[in-house]
Curated annotation (Swiss-Prot):
Recorded superkingdom: Bacteria
Example of a GO MF term: DNA-binding transcription factor activity
Keyword flag Ion transport: no
A Pfam family of this chain: MarR
Gene, per the UniProt record: ywoH
Keywords: DNA-binding, Transcription, Transcription regulation
Key word Transcription present: yes
Protein name as it appears in the record: Uncharacterized HTH-type transcriptional regulator YwoH
Location of the HTH marR-type domain: 5-136
DNA-binding region: 51-74
Length: 137
């Protein structure tokens, strides 16, 4: 087994933690954490979703998403609405969240650009390709 294979998962995990830490610094002025931003991004990109759809999409355990949504709801970022089925609750962005979203997204896109500035476009494409493959497993 090569050195790369023995340490790749650890390196990915450490990189993800570092990115989350730096993202939290960017999101602090908005009173958000990266885990909360992931939910907001998901809802804005995909649209209203059930909690199950959110945790499935984000590959996060249900209790974690439940707590995150509860905090977002308490802080006015999301609300739960009745779905088509009476038992189904959809999570949606509030009007206030919709207004603030673009400002936050611009900041996060700039953060991403700065974070990846030293990488060649080919490297970024390779990262993207490999992560898509990994997520499809």
């Amino acid at each position: 087994m090569s050195y790369v294979n023995r340490h790749l998962i650890h390196q990915i995990n450490q990189s993800a933690r570092l990115i989350a830490k730096k993202a939290n610094e960017q999101l602090e002025p908005f009173g958000l954490y990266s885990s909360q931003w992931s939910v907001l991004y998901c809802l804005r990109t995909i649209g209203p979703m059930t909690q199950k759809e959110i945790w499935s999409y984000l590959n996060v355990e249900a209790p974690t998403v439940t707590r995150t949504i509860k905090r977002l709801e308490e802080n006015g970022w999301v609300q739960r609405r009745q779905g088509e089925d009476k038992r189904e609750k959809l999570v949606v962005l509030t009007k206030e969240a919709e207004k603030k979203y673009e400002e936050i997204n611009v900041k996060m896109l700039k953060f991403e650009e700065e974070l990846l500035a030293d990488f060649r476009d080919e490297d970024k494409e390779a990262f993207s390709h490999l992560f898509r493959m990994f997520l499809q497993q």
